[in-house]
């Protein structure tokens, strides 16, 4: 990336696949150095304009499965669809893959018959289900909670089968009620993304297109979803992606969409202002709820929109996660006067 910046004399260069966070950090750091060197805001804006050449996409592309969103869930869906024999196209509006998973801790809760007994931890799927329901004040859908908890350890095994390595110890993530949180051996959720990217690079039946934003989900006369209309951010051209077997919307949440979160804030935090002073722990450029809104436009039902999670470890103002290397069981929260308030 550094070589490209020097060659093009621009920050508007592509990152390196498999090193998305490092590429983004390097370009940000160079930009900060330019600011310190008194480069004007206007010149800096010009330096950030993209200088890469992009071949225009066809007006229409056909595949079996179209996935909107190249974050953790979208890439996991792409790998699973590929393993099932489908041809897949993933559409990602940013110039890098990973979305909010890239900036997560990567915790995955699962009752583990291998790791937990070695640590003297008693657990079961039934206990996981019970604690998940109680942790949600018993407003969760029991069938979905059961599906989540029963599928949690198989998800760990599946991730391991494609190359993810987990630590031998399990912890207690923030908000968890039991010591069953699995963490990648290499810290952060970016570990998952690197494995997904490696798998996709080795399987030509999965095509990833970045810098392209889905604008509309399309239906036929019978109401069946048949494709996606998307606009390439760099060329400004539209492409119709026809999906023979279906479209998966995996665009994540809406934590960075201040207007939307204020509109739906009718739940436990309705007495509080979730305006701009509250940051977003997710990757802000992607956490806009675009997939939810597109789904609603074609008749999809939505549930739980008011069930907004407020995280205690976000940096005030920005919401970026603070790297607090302690268990959720042993933190003490104090205010600026040193008084405990939790």
What kind of feature is each model-predicted range?
Residues 1-49:
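Active-site- and interface-proximal helix/loop "cap" or "latch" segments in soluble metabolic
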Residues 45-62, 338:
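A short, basic/flexible loop-to-alpha-helix module at the beginning of a structural domain
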Residues 54-73, 89:
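Beta1/beta-strand and adjacent pyrophosphate-binding region of the FAD-binding site
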Residues 83-103:
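Glycine-rich FAD pyrophosphate-binding loop
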Residues 96, 102-207, 211-216, 261-263, ...:
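Conserved N-terminal/central alpha/beta ligand/cofactor-binding core
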Residues 187-245, 292, 298:
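Helical element adjacent to the flavin cofactor pocket in flavoenzyme catalytic cores
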Residues 234-237, 242-314:
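Glycine-rich loop(s) and the adjacent beta-strand/alpha-helix scaffold that form part
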Residues 308-342:
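FAD cofactor-binding and catalytic pocket of flavoenzymes
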């Amino acid at each position: 990336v550094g070589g490209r910046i020097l060659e093009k004399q621009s920050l508007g260069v592509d990152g390196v696949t498999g090193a998305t966070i490092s590429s983004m950090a390097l370009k940000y750091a160079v930009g900060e150095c330019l600011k310190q060197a008194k480069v004007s805001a206007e010149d800096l804006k010009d330096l950030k304009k993209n200088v890469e050449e992009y071949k225009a996409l066809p007006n229409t592309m056909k595949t079996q499965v179209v996935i909107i969103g190249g974050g953790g869930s979208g890439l996991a869906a792409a790998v699973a669809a590929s393993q099932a024999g489908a041809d897949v196209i993933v559409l990602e509006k940013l110039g890098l893959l990973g979305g909010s998973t890239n900036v997560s801790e990567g915790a995955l809760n699962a009752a583990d018959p291998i790791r937990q007994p070695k640590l003297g931890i008693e657990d079961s799927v039934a206990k996981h289900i019970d604690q998940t329901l109680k942790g949600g004040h018993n407003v969760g859908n029991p069938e979905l909670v059961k599906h989540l908890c029963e599928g949690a350890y198989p998800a760990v095994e599946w991730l391991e089968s494609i190359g993810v390595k987990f630590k031998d110890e399990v912890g207690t993530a923030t908000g968890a009620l039991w010591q069953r949180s699995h963490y990648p051996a290499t810290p952060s959720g970016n570990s998952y993304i690197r494995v997904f990217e490696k798998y996709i690079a080795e399987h030509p039946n999965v095509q990833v297109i970045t810098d392209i934003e889905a604008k509309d989900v399309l239906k036929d006369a019978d109401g069946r979803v048949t494709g996606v209309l998307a606009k390439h951010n760099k060329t400004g051209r539209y492409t119709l992606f026809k999906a023979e077997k279906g479209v998966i919307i995996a665009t994540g949440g809406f934590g960075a969409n201040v207007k939307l979160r204020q509109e739906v804030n009718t739940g436990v935090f309705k007495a509080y202002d979730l305006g701009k002073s509250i940051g977003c722990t997710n990757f802000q450029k992607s956490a806009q709820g675009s997939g939810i809104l597109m789904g609603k436009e074609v008749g999809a039902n939505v549930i739980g929109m008011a069930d907004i999670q407020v995280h205690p470890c976000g940096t005030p103002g920005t919401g970026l996660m603070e790297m607090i290397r302690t268990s959720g069981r042993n933190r003490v929260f104090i205010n600026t006067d040193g008084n405990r308030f939790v």
